[in-house]
Amino acid sequence: MARVKRGVQAHARHKKVLKAAKGYYSARRKTFRVAKQAVIKAGQYAYRDRKTKKRQFRQLWIIRINAGARIHGLSYSRFINGLKKSGIAVDRKILSELAVYDKSVFATLAEKAKAALSA
């Protein structure tokens, strides 16, 4: 039986890793051993940050809604409570967009929330 050399597979594997490390600086781009570690670490960061992105955007939306609600004399929690009591089901992403870009619609929502809280 002929001896099997693994040069082709090794070269393909190295090429794959170095392609994934494109755009990195110095040895992280050129040297296979260092590039492999850098690609693995980048994957770990990407996995972690896909989770934190959701948290960060929710925080941003809440900050924007709170700022918009305080202009109309409500805190964030009272505004959300008022919306729930009045039966308005709008998610935080849309509420934050309204608070930033469509202030007149947000003002009507704030008035409805106030009315539901006082009733």
UniProtKB/Swiss-Prot annotation:
The keyword rRNA-binding applies. InterPro entries: Ribosomal_bL20 (IPR005813), RIBOSOMAL_L20_CS (IPR049946), Ribosomal_protein_bL20_C (IPR035566). It comes from Dichelobacter nodosus (strain VCS1703A). Belongs to the bacterial ribosomal protein bL20 family. Pfam families: Ribosomal_L20. GO terms for biological process: ribosomal large subunit assembly; translation. NCBIfam families: rplT_bact. It comes from the Bacteria. This is Large ribosomal subunit protein bL20. One of its GO terms (molecular function) is rRNA binding. Keywords: Ribonucleoprotein, Ribosomal protein, RNA-binding, rRNA-binding. GO terms for cellular component: ribonucleoprotein complex; ribosome. Binds directly to 23S ribosomal RNA and is necessary for the in vitro assembly process of the 50S ribosomal subunit. It is not involved in the protein synthesizing functions of that subunit.
